[in-house]
Amino acid sequence: MSSNLYLKRMASKLYFKITNKDECHHGFQYEDGLNILDNEFNDNPKDSCVPGRLYFTEIHHMHKYLEFGIYLREVYLPIDNPSFRMIRDSSGDKYGANMIVLGIKRDLRDKKTWEYLVSKGINLYENNALNWASKYGFLEIVKLIMENKINCYFGKAKKAYQLAITYGHTDVVDFLKTYVNTNSDYNFVLRGNDMVIYFKC
């Protein structure tokens, strides 16, 4: 496949990037529209998570990067720019480029953002998303995730349940307890703001 055909195929996909509150990562300030790397592009295929790349990912890997920030950005590739370069990261779950276009910004704390992500096919088989929402106490997002999880069988939400307890989100705890295996060797109980673990004899 020629490089032009490859780029056209890649550009036809929808990509995402998670940004923090200030949308500044490792000294690079992201803005709406075209963002161009301000130093030399790293095109070494063996490198991973290195300077010299503007990173982005596909929908089915996005759940791995939820801790990176609070905003979800749509990413487009400016393949018509003759200076555009990109590479698949050696980790296999993201890409790096010397320039990207940032589109719509959505708030990951908003349930509507998750309705959008579900419609686009976010990976809910892994529990990253559920654990994240439970840790930060986003009850409506937890409910939405559980409603759309195919593998939410009994006991699958154990880590999410423990995170909700640890961070004191009692409403999430109450919701998730029906999904947790109560026949385990220990029980978690909230006492005020403290977590108490009772081991069964």
UniProtKB/Swiss-Prot annotation:
InterPro entries, per database record = Ankyrin_rpt, Ankyrin_rpt-contain_sf
What transmembrane ranges does the database entry give?
none
Q: Alphabetically list the UniProt keywords.
A: ANK repeat, Repeat
> Which domain of life does this protein belong to?
Viruses
In the record for this protein, the ANK repeats are positioned at: 125-154, 156-188
Q: What is this protein called?
A: Putative ankyrin repeat protein R868
What is the species listed in this Swiss-Prot or TrEMBL entry? Acanthamoeba polyphaga mimivirus (APMV)
